[in-house]
Regions:
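Glycan-processing catalytic domains of CAZymes
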Residues: 1-183
Length: 183
């Protein structure tokens, strides 16, 4: 037991409760990780305020997203900051805009707070508009994350179908990890 995922993609309205939960968690499990995964810049204003599950709303602004990151760090005081940004949308070579801006905000704010950041790597497809990544696209996501200072790489595989051939795209993260590990 290394910790617990408390909430995925909370909104600003949840931060006070998360702060109280973290204080209790730290009291009883001081050596464990209180883990919350945060939203990307393409979340709507409603999602950043109310949480991802609410949906709807207008496109958010960079200012609101920066407030979201800063408020979470200052109120919850996490051991690390985790977020997701799934850039490989629609057909190749489309990449969701804001990928580097999002990473820059997270890298900057976590550096100020002296905490590491982790990021999720898109490793599969879902919902019709998110494509299956190639090995090169997974490598690109991992290497750009490391270049920005990410200390944790997580792979979002959703419901990757089982295949034990070693050639299925579900094996791409293993290959990337081997390459990074050999450096």
């Amino acid at each position: 037991f290394s910790g617990i995922l408390v909430q995925d993609e909370p909104g600003l309205v949840h931060f006070d409760n998360l702060s109280a939960m973290k204080k209790n968690f730290d009291k009883y499990f001081p050596q464990k990780t209180f883990y919350t995964n945060m939203m990307p810049t393409y979340a709507t204003d409603n999602q950043l305020n109310q949480g991802a599950a609410t949906g709807g709303g207008s496109p958010s602004t960079i200012e609101l997203y920066q407030k979201y990151v800063i408020d979470f760090i200052s109120k919850v005081k996490p051991q690390m900051f985790s977020y997701d940004f799934y850039p490989m949308m629609n057909e190749f070579p489309n990449i969701e805009k804001g990928y580097f801006e999002n990473m820059s905000i997270v890298a900057s704010e976590t550096a100020k707070a002296k905490i590491p950041f982790w990021t999720f790597i898109q490793a599969t497809s879902w919902g019709g508009n998110v494509r299956i990544c190639t090995q090169a696209e997974i490598d690109w996501q991992v290497n750009t994350s490391l270049a920005y200072g990410a200390k944790g790489i997580q792979y979002f595989s959703y419901w990757t179908p089982y295949d034990d051939s070693g050639t299925h795209p579900g094996y791409y993260p293993n290959r990337t990890d081997e390459q990074i590990g050999s450096m």
